[in-house]
């Protein structure tokens, strides 16, 4: 039996953080060596970080990445390793994976298919390498190495690459690599988290290993790398159609290795037995780069306990989406806190669902970090903070790093005041009350004197609502500034779609953790957190005080009985309209037709009113979406104009389409 010990690593990197990124890669090398690993696959662009954006066009970025690569070479003795970096070749930047073997740079594989949809803008920074093309890349010392569409023969073991997006396309490179008889396909990836996406990855890794008759190593990034995208890790190793090792997801560690023992003879004989396998005997030998390597010496290292971790029980349960949401946002918040070197989090806790959800997620960030890293690990991660409690537990850490404030005006009620206090107490947050009624009254007096008339709800409704939200902004910002904390805003995606928020009021903040998720899911998730909660952490029964309420902005006088859904439409309908109109790009008439069978409890005429309301509010409020604080990417329905959904600030507002809708709705019998 010809056995190799292989590993795929997930790394929590930071764009342009040269010291940390290099140390983290070195740590992966050291752990792999200690485990007796001879083949190690690291993530895409791991030396620079994936999210460098326009810094990929900085000569400094390219030089430092190359220097880091050269610095790592001696540490790869006795191993075959791949690391990702940008490479400037013939005045074009390519997204490359460098293959290092026994202390030498063997070659550079350039990515063939660039990710240019969703949050990805790779074609802005990189050029796609053409299939079948091989060149020589000049090194600073005057020597050259192969670059391009390469595969490798390292001491008789053959390696090929699919770099992230390469594996997601129909004509993936693996088919040609199979013809060259490769033993391993290495996939260094930077695949951001989205709900359910792990299952897609598993399918192409498994199918690639089966169809190509290879062992497939999939490495990924981990954590909140650059602010918006969350990477869940989840390394995968498959061989001949079987998943042989999986790594855990949403880890708070800097890195994790997933390892496996691979029987090289078994995979080769599998290819030999396959009637459909056709070796490419006339293939271009220039594409195969050969390097010497002593596998006998490499495999003589004693193999110790493997460091790969199986999927947690939460991934097998019935609440996978709820668990993914909780763990993804918790990890993203913790990483944002430490990478921004902030003093904590500050939050205006209104007593409603959105701010309660944000507070719970902050507490979950601390709970998750402590559960995995323990006291010493959390202190190390938060070493920028001068003062942490002597005894670290979830409650003491939340008390130290989360400040909440309830800010009532004369239109606030005891229900929300009591709910805010109850949630803060249950979570352990430091809770304050800032009564802004006098500030609110002061603005009304100033404006009424200026315009020469009293303001009235019948004629000045929006202005009177918005000023209440805006007077809450200066005080909560001041609290955040006192401790150098991140102010968290609480708008959700449903509100962002229709602009149901006060700019410079409840949108105030440095980070908007839930702006990527819809209100309907948030309400469901809060009920789940009240009764069930994530595996290993449990429920928060105190959320019952939130879940009993109907969502309300609480900006009109108490007698008005204001609710969000009266102002807008039912939230489940709003989310369905948003998906049809924005994600799927249907016209107003088409959206109206789609909604009728989905919501038969409402008349066609009423649905037409709500569909028109959505399109009007959507078009009118793009300027607000442009100004929202950065939010986390969670699925394919994101409205972030910087990374996902671009829309003109000024447009025709669907006037012609909505006229057609009104005519059609008017002709339908009621």
Sequence positions of predicted segments:
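Enzyme catalytic cores with a strong preference for nitrogen-chemistry domains
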Residues: 1-348, 359-388, 426, 431
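ATP/NTP-dependent adenylation/nucleotidyl-transfer catalytic domains that generate, transfer
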Residues: 155, 214, 225-226, 247, ...
């Amino acid at each position: 039996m010809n056995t190799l010990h292989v590993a795929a690593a997930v790394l929590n990197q930071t764009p342009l953080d040269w010291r940390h990124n290099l140390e983290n890669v070195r740590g992966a090398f050291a752990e792999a060596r200690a485990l007796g690993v001879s083949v190690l696959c690291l993530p895409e662009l791991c030396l620079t970080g994936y999210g460098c954006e326009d810094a990929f066009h900085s000569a400094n970025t390219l030089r430092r990445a190359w220097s880091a690569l050269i610095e790592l070479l001696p540490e790869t003795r006795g191993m075959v390793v791949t690391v990702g970096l940008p490479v400037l070749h013939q005045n074009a930047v390519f997204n490359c994976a460098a293959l290092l073997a026994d202390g030498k740079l063997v070659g550079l594989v350039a990515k063939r298919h660039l990710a240019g949809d969703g949050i990805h803008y790779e074609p802005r920074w990189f050029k796609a390498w053409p299939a079948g093309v091989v060149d020589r890349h000049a090194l600073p010392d005057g020597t050259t190495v192969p670059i391009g569409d390469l595969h490798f023969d390292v001491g008789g073991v053959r390696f090929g690459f699919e770099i992230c997006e390469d594996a997601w396309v129909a004509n993936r490179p693996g088919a040609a690599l199979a013809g060259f008889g490769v033993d391993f396909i290495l996939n260094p990836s930077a695949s951001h988290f989205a709900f359910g996406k792990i299952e897609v990855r598993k399918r192409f890794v498994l199918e690639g290993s089966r169809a190509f008759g290879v062992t497939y190593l999939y490495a990924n990034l981990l954590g909140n790398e650059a602010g918006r995208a969350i990477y869940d890790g989840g390394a995968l190793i498959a061989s001949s159609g079987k998943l042989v090792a999986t790594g855990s997801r949403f880890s708070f560690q800097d890195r994790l290795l997933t390892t496996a023992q691979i029987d090289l003879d078994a995979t080769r004989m599998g290819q030999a037995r396959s009637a459909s396998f056709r070796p490419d005997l006339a293939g271009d030998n220039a594409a195969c780069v050969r390097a010497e390597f002593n596998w006998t010496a490499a495999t003589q290292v004693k193999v110790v306990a493997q460091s790969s971790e199986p999927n947690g029980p939460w991934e097998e349960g019935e609440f996978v989406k709820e668990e993914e949401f909780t763990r993804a946002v918790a990890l993203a918040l913790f990483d944002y806190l430490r990478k921004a070197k902030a003093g904590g989090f500050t939050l205006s806790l209104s007593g409603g669902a959105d701010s309660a959800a944000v507070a719970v997620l902050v507490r979950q960030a601390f709970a998750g970090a402590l559960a995995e890293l323990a006291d010493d690990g959390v202190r190390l991660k938060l070493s920028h903070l001068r003062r942490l409690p002597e005894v670290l537990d979830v409650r003491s850490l939340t008390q130290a790093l989360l400040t909440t404030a309830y800010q009532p005006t004369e239109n606030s009620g005891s229900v929300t005041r009591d709910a805010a206090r109850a949630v803060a107490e249950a979570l352990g947050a430091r809770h304050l009350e800032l009564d802004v009624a006098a500030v609110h009254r002061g603005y009304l007096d100033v404006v009424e004197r200026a315009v020469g008339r009293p303001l009235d709800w019948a004629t000045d409704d929006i202005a009177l609502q918005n000023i209440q939200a805006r007077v809450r902004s200066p005080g909560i910002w001041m609290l955040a500034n006192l401790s150098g904390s991140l102010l968290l805003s609480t708008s959700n995606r449903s509100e962002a779609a229709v602009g149901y928020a006060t700019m410079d009021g409840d949108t105030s903040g440095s980070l908007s953790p839930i702006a990527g998720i819809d209100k309907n899911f948030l309400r469901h998730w809060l009920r789940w957190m009240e009764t069930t909660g994530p595996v290993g952490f449990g429920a928060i029964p105190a959320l019952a005080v939130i879940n009993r309420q109907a969502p309300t902005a609480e900006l009109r006088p108490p007698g008005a009985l204001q609710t969000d859904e009266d102002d807008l439409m039912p939230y489940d309908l709003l989310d369905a309209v948003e998906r049809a109109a924005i994600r799927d790009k249907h016209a107003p008439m088409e959206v109206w037709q789609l909604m009728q069978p989905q919501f038969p409890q409402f008349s066609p005429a009423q649905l037409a009113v709500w569909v028109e309301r959505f399109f009007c509010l959507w078009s009118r409020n793009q300027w607000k979406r442009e100004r929202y604080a950065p939010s986390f990417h969670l699925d394919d329905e994101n409205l972030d104009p910087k990374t996902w959904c671009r829309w003109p600030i000024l447009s025709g507002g669907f006037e012609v389409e909505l006229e057609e809708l009104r005519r059609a709705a008017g002709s339908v019998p009621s």
